Each structure stands twice: as C-alpha cells, then as structure tokens.
Curated annotation (Swiss-Prot):
Gene Ontology molecular-function annotations: protein-lysine N-methyltransferase activity
Organism whose genome encodes this protein: Clostridium kluyveri (strain ATCC 8527 / DSM 555 / NBRC 12016 / NCIMB 10680 / K1)
Function: Methylates ribosomal protein L11.
Compartments (UniProt record): Cytoplasm
This protein's UniProt keywords: Cytoplasm, Methyltransferase, S-adenosyl-L-methionine, Transferase
HAMAP family assigned: Methyltr_PrmA
A Pfam family this chain is assigned to: PrmA
Classification of source organism: Bacteria, Bacillati, Bacillota, Clostridia, Eubacteriales
Name assigned to this protein: Ribosomal protein L11 methyltransferase
Binding site for S-adenosyl-L-methionine: 163, 184, 206, 248
Reactions this protein catalyses: L-lysyl-[protein] + 3 S-adenosyl-L-methionine = N(6),N(6),N(6)-trimethyl-L-lysyl-[protein] + 3 S-adenosyl-L-homocysteine + 3 H(+)
EC main group: transferase
Gene (UniProt): prmA
Coiled coil: none
C-alpha cells in the first residue's frame, strides 16, 4: 500500500522565495520544490530547454509556488501554524510576500516519487557534465562526463540554475589534487560531479537523512569510492581543509557561514556559493569581502547568482 504525504503549496512573490525557504528549513520538511513564474514564462518560450515542470503552475499569474512535503505526524499542524505565522510576518520584515497563500493537500508517495520521472531526461549541466537519470538511455559524446542520478525525494536533479552554475564552476576549478567539500549535498550531484572531474577526495554533508541516503545511493550508482558522506548540520562532520568548498543553499545560510568557511579552506582555496537570489547579490558580495574573501567571478542565470571567491 502506498504511503500518503502532506504537500504544502505556498504562493508568494519572487522576492519572498528565499525567506520562505528558510522558514521551511526550520521545520521537519522532507523535500522542497520551487517554481518561479519568471522561470515558467521562460520555459513556455523555450520548451526544449527544460526537463520538468508542473503545468498547473501556469495558473499562477505572478510570483512563485513553493511545494513542501511532510510525513503525517502530530507535529505537522504545529509546523503549519509556524509556517503561516511567519509568512504573514514577512511584511513586517520589509519583504513583499505577494499572495502569501498556503494550501494543504495529501499526495500519494508513488505519485510524488515517480510521477515526474517521465519528464526527467538526460541534461547537459555544463560543458562536460551530463546528468542522466538511471532509467534513461544516453549516447555519450566525446569528452562527456556522465553523472547517473536518481534524486528520489532529495533536492538535486541538476536542472536548477544554481546547480548548473555550481557544476560549471567545478568544471573550471577542480584539479587532480583537489580536496572538495560539498555542504548541503542533497542528492549528491555536486559531490559526484567533483569526483568525476578528477578531485582527489570529496566530503559531502547534509542535515536531511533522506538526502544522505539518496547521496549514498547515487554515489554507488556511479561506482565512486572517494566520496565520504556525513549526516550533520552544515559544517558538522567536516574535518581538515578543502581546496574547494561549495554551498548551494540560500543566501542567509551563506551569510551565516562565511566566517566559518575560512577555517575549512586552504590558502587561496576556492569558495563556490550559490542558491542566492539576485536581489541579495550585493549583500553576499559585501559580506564575503568584509570577511577577507576576494571575488573571482559572479555568474547569473535567471533570478539566481553563483559567486566564486577565494581567501585574500
């Protein structure tokens, strides 16, 4: 018998996406998906450039739809109250919440886990890296590096702008001697990409046990032996120093970790930070510079930013 999950759909402004994501990550959320209508308009005009999105979102005229998934439990309704309260409080923080609508539905686990798979096809995420779902065929081209993925319930299919920018940065900076830390690994896609690009050793960390399990499975699918995966909160479980440290989460997390990141990077080590909405680019750049980082490059894709920096 299929299990049922609770799906919380939240309709807010594009400006509020990052804040709402932060609210959700303070609960026992098992999975989050985000669709921005600005992205949807682009996808309607460029139907060949994307792999999956929910056509029901076309009914949303503006803003973004954030879907969060929870197991049925006694604590869920406490979380729901917390979510609604904090979304309503966004205006007091100077953030336009848009509609601020919260809708709750029950979804079948099989529908959630497998219904999207027919839309998820092999996808070129960088110049070399190609993301291939396990169940799809792909004919390798010269110099292709194929990453086999079954994201399951973990965040990280490789199609999001922030993931693609991180992969392109890894393609540019990973060297054979590189030791790479992937903080908030999700499905493990960035850790696997780093390993396949030739990194000597990779450490991946995630707070979500579902993500840790997903990452371990995906690592095994790719027959990789040099990735260590830890269950922990952000920098917990990380030891030693990295040549490259990548975080693809949200701006607030990056802002809170910038000073600590320095302790885990070698001299002139590379910090790849993404998950940053474009409106907060300058805030993150200033914070990095104030903490002794030199900005190497800033890349933008849609409403998202990836910043590559190094210790001065």
């Amino acid at each position: 018998m299929s299990k049922e999950w609770i799906e919380v759909s939240i309709i807010v402004s594009s400006e509020a996406v990052e804040a709402v994501s932060g609210i959700l990550y303070n609960t026992e959320v098992e999975g989050i998906s985000i669709e921005d209508t600005k992205d949807i308009e682009f996808k309607k005009k460029h139907p060949g450039d994307w792999d999956y999105f929910d056509e029901s979102l076309l009914k949303v005229e503006e803003g973004a739809v954030i879907k969060a998934y929870y197991r049925e439990s006694e604590s869920f309704y406490g979380y729901l109250k917390y979510i609604r309260h904090n979304i309503n409080n966004l205006e007091n923080l100077g953030i336009d919440k848009g509609k601020g609508l919260v809708v709750v539905n029950k979804v079948n686990e099989e529908d959630w886990e497998n219904g999207w798979k027919k839309y998820y096809k092999p996808y070129r995420a960088g110049e070399k890296i190609v993301i291939k779902p396990l169940w799809e065929e792909y004919e390798n081209k010269k110099q292709d590096i194929v990453v086999e993925i079954d994201p399951g319930m973990a965040f990280g299919t490789g199609t999001h702008e922030t993931t693609k920018m991180c992969i392109k940065a890894l393609e540019k900076y990973v060297r054979p001697e590189s030791n790479v830390f992937d903080i908030g690994t999700g499905s493990g896609i960035l850790a696997i990409a780093a390993s396949k690009l030739g990194a000597k050793e990779v450490t991946a960390v995630d707070l979500d046990p579902v993500a840790v399990e997903s990452a371990l499975k995906n690592i095994s699918y790719n027959n990789i032996k040099n990735i260590k995966v830890f269950h922990g909160n952000l920098m917990e479980g990380v030891h030693g120093k990295a040549d490259i440290l990548v975080i693809n989460i949200i701006a607030d997390v990056i802002l809170s970790l910038t000073e600590e990141v320095k302790k885990f990077l070698v001299s002139e080590g590379i910090f790849i930070s993404s998950g940053i909405i474009i409106d907060r680019k300058e805030e993150v750049v200033e914070n990095l510079q104030n903490n002794g980082f030199c900005i190497r490059e800033i890349n933008e894709d849609g409403e998202w930013v990836c910043i590559v920096s190094t210790i001065k």
